[in-house]
């Protein structure tokens, strides 16, 4: 990998209530691209991944949030932490590096509307 390129894991969250998610590993991610550019890349790449079930390939993902950064503590939340949105939700106009993404970072890709609904009423179905 070239300098400035890292490996990150993207957790595709289909349902917060049912804890339905799939991790996808990306190698060679350029940290100098904007969050918006990375979202566009993910939206183009995910539907082409035949190893993902159709419900994950065809979902309306639109937001990214940091789940875990390498060598830092993890939360006890099974799908995604509902705290620290100001710091962990990625803003589209910043670069991945400025947003805090580094090698081995795990981020969530989800529908922001679903996240807000779940945050307002965090009940799991099982």
UniProtKB/Swiss-Prot annotation:
This is UPF0538 protein C2orf76. It comes from the Eukaryota. Belongs to the UPF0538 family. The gene is C2orf76. InterPro entries: UPF0538.
């Amino acid at each position: 990998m070239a300098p400035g390129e890292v490996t990150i894991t993207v957790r595709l969250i289909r349902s917060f209530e049912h804890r339905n998610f799939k991790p996808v590993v990306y190698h060679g991610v350029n940290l100098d691209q904007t969050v918006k550019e990375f979202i566009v890349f993910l939206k183009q790449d995910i539907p082409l991944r035949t190893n993902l079930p159709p419900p994950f390939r065809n979902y309306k993902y639109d937001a990214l949030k940091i789940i875990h950064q390498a060598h830092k503590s993890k939360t006890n939340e099974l799908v995604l932490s509902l705290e620290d949105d100001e710091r962990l939700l990625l803003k589209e106009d910043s670069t991945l590096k400025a947003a805090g993404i580094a090698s081995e970072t795990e981020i969530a890709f989800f529908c922001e509307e679903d996240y807000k609904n779940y945050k307002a009423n965090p009940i799991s179905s099982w």
